[in-house]
Amino acid sequence: YRTDNKPINYNPYNLVLNPVIARPKQNFRTQFNYKLDNTFTLRSRVELSWFDKKSEAPQNGFLTFIDFLYKPMLKPFSGNVRLQYFETDDYDSRIYAFENDVLYGYSIPSFFNKGYRYYVNGNYDVSKKLSFWIRFAQTIYSEKNTIGSGLDLINGNKKSEVKMQMIYRF
């Protein structure tokens, strides 16, 4: 559980001075990890968010995901998959989720509006000196025809990303 009070300017009556008030946001998160055996791990999370906008109706958010992690002992390959659903009323009730990524990379995107996200990560160690990493991720927004704005505008409701990495240790 987490609660936070952000100060905002609040002026619904167009006063000369904008009074500053606290705008509360609350998050509740529960996570479940289960090691099926020495090779497979299952991880699941559910997160809820509540955001009080004072002059408007409160905003809510919901996110859930399930991860399948595969890491065999003494094998040169490993990988993981995430399937995720999110639904929030607007950007203020967004929810952040850490994602597994390529080595030395990181991803903590924010999720708002309504949609799905999945990603697949793979790693193959060719030798002690050479390894390859690959990642494919895609977000599908249920109720949008365009994503982003300006130079980042995407016509369509899908946003995809691909990362490939080769590491040579010497």
Tell me the role of every PLM-derived stretch.
Residues 1-170:
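Exposed, low-structure sequence patches enriched in small/polar residues
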